A protein has these predicted regions:
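Conserved beta-strand-loop surface patch within small alpha/beta domains used
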Residues: 1-76, 85-146
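Short, well-ordered beta-to-alpha junction loops that form the rim of enzyme active sites
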Residues: 82
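Phosphate-binding glycine-rich loops of NTP-binding sites
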Residues: 79
Length: 146
């Protein structure tokens, strides 16, 4: 079970609101060190293009990001992005996660993150060993530390 400080959730929502402006999707990554992978420590906002109905991460940014993660001993644990209304995992979300590893989590925040800070009406899904996605309860995967 991942542990995340409340400040990271607040930072996530602030970034979503600033980037998306209640008009566009936005995506972030939650990181943790390899020597303590269950304690999330950092939010990363990738360079991306976005619209109301999708986004694309810049490939040059991703290449540099992998190098930075290796140098700093960090790994991506959860990708987090917004949707314009209801939170769900679209076919595009299923097909293009940052990682395709079993157990990788994708969290979708509804309403471009303009609602209350937290996981109300959010959707969490996890890659299964066969490559499919399965919705999982947020409380079974993430603990918020006040």
């Amino acid at each position: 079970m991942y542990r995340i400080p409340r400040r990271m959730i607040e930072q996530t929502f602030a970034t979503f609101r600033s980037c998306g402006g209640n008009q566009r999707e936005c995506q972030l990554y939650w990181l943790s060190p390899w020597d303590n992978p269950l304690v999330l420590t950092e939010v990363v906002h990738p360079k991306h293009w976005s619209s109301r109905y999708g986004l694309r991460i810049e490939s040059d940014w991703i290449n540099q990001f992998w190098n930075d993660l290796a140098e700093r001993g960090l790994g991506v644990r959860i990708q987090v992005h917004t949707h314009p209304s209801e939170a769900f995992h679209s076919a595009t979300d299923d097909a293009y996660p940052l990682l395709f590893d079993a157990g990788f989590l994708s969290l979708v925040i509804p309403d471009f993150a303009m609602g209350p800070v937290g996981f109300c009406n959010a959707y969490l899904t996890e890659i299964q060993p066969d490559g499919s996605w399965q919705q999982v309860a947020i409380a079974e995967r993430i603990i918020v530390d006040e």
